């Protein structure tokens, strides 16, 4: 399948899901939106679940490129920075990646359907696990470079990732409700660095 056709199918699916809800979108509707026959759609994707999973992977990679997120060289990332600088940079990058228009719209659909759709729940779990694993790698590197100290880096990474995830949702909800976003995320990062400083 050409990248152009793949993107066209993914964007059509995203638009339909945003308007009708993922559970209400059929392969037939997607084919009609793209202007192809339903059997042709099955030449590209075996099922709607496969299409949604592929959409997640595609949009995530697109968002990473747009947010300029690539492989991390911890030595250069840490050079001349405090622990707080590093956490602000990495959390800010993740936040920016998820605010990319297509990724943001995808998450709105997935989050609204995760209690009803096993596929949506699977994607939320997958993204959360990616966030936890990336945080573990970051914390091990920060400990090796003596930027922070953790008694249990794995549990600290889990706690940190879930707290940041929750605070990002909270910030989104504040903004969506028409309120000014608070500084709770930055306050948390400051507190976290103080609690885990190298002594």
Label for each model-derived stretch:
Residues 122-128, 144-161:
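All-alpha amphipathic helical-bundle segments outside canonical DNA-binding/catalytic cores
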Residues 22, 45, 109-116:
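Short helix-capping/turn signature of helix-turn-helix
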Residues 64, 85, 97-111, 118-144:
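Amphipathic alpha-helical packing segments from all-alpha helical-bundle domains
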């Amino acid at each position: 399948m050409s990248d152009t056709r793949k993107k066209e199918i993914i964007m059509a699916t995203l638009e339909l899901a945003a308007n009708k809800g993922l559970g209400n979108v059929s392969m037939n509707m997607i084919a009609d939106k793209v202007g192809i026959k339903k059997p042709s759609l099955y030449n590209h994707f075996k099922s709607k679940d496969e299409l949604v999973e592929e959409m997640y992977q595609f949009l995530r990679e697109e968002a990473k490129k747009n947010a300029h997120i690539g492989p991390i060289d911890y030595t250069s990332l840490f050079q001349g920075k405090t622990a707080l600088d590093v956490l602000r940079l990495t959390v800010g990058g993740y936040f920016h990646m998820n605010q990319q228009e297509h990724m943001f719209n995808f998450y709105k659909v997935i989050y609204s359907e995760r209690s009803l759709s096993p596929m949506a729940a699977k994607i939320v779990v997958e993204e959360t696990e990616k966030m936890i694993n990336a945080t573990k790698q970051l914390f091990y590197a920060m400990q090796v470079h003596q930027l922070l100290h953790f008694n249990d880096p794995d549990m600290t990474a889990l706690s940190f990732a879930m707290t940041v995830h929750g605070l990002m949702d909270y910030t989104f909800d504040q903004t969506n409700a028409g309120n000014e976003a608070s500084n709770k995320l930055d306050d948390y990062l400051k507190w976290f660095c103080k609690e885990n400083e190298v002594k």
